[in-house]
Amino acid sequence: MARDSLIIKPLEDISVLSGFHCGIQAMDNFIHDGLEESIRNHYCNSYSVYLDSTLVAMFALGFDSLELDSDSIDEMVEGISTNKPELSKNYVDTFLSKHHYPALEIAYLAVEQQHRNKGIGQAIVNAIADMAQKQKMAGCMFLTVEAYIEKDYSAVPFYNVCGFEPCEYRNPNKETLRMYKTLYPRID
């Protein structure tokens, strides 16, 4: 799916999502019963995604901070991680001395059930990365996501395909896995 065929608009009227269903019950429940409160309370800004005039997806974004442990940073520096950022030679020591890194969180991403597995989600992630790189409001080095995991569904493989890596070990008592992706990958 070419991302230029998708139309992304700020979600100004939550009622456009009234008939929206991604097929994952917990996510559908949140979209219909919790998203509006999250927007109203400044947790995130939401967007609707159209293919021609058909609503095919929605997503929400919020500013975030990525905390990496020393093992993750070592893997990045050694090139083991695919998320090694491009850094100027003079900035490497400064980068390594940080404990938190500026990020943009994909708070929610859902594709309409009949449009799943068509490349729309991946095109949206690429568009979000472009948006994060082009915005001028704040520094942003990474995308983050709490990838949803339930008994019958896991978003982790999808985000792996999109270039995300876990930044924590899977906790079976938690319904998400925190993952990250660099916005400015180093090309060796």
Locate each region found by the language model.
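Conserved active-site alpha-helix within GNAT-family acetyltransferase domains
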Residues: 138-140, 147-169
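Conserved beta-hairpin
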Residues: 44-62
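Conserved glycine-rich acetyl-CoA-binding loop
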Residues: 99, 112-123, 151-154
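Conserved GNAT acetyl-CoA-binding A-motif
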Residues: 125, 132-147
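Conserved acetyl-CoA-binding loop-helix of GNAT-fold acetyltransferases
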Residues: 117-131, 161
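Conserved acyl-donor/pantetheine-binding loop and adjacent beta-alpha core of acyl/acetyltransferases
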Residues: 63-108
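Short glycine/proline-centered loop/turn elements that form peptide/ligand docking sites
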Residues: 125, 151-155, 169-179
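Short amphipathic alpha-helix that is part of the acyltransferase structural core
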Residues: 1-37, 41, 46-48
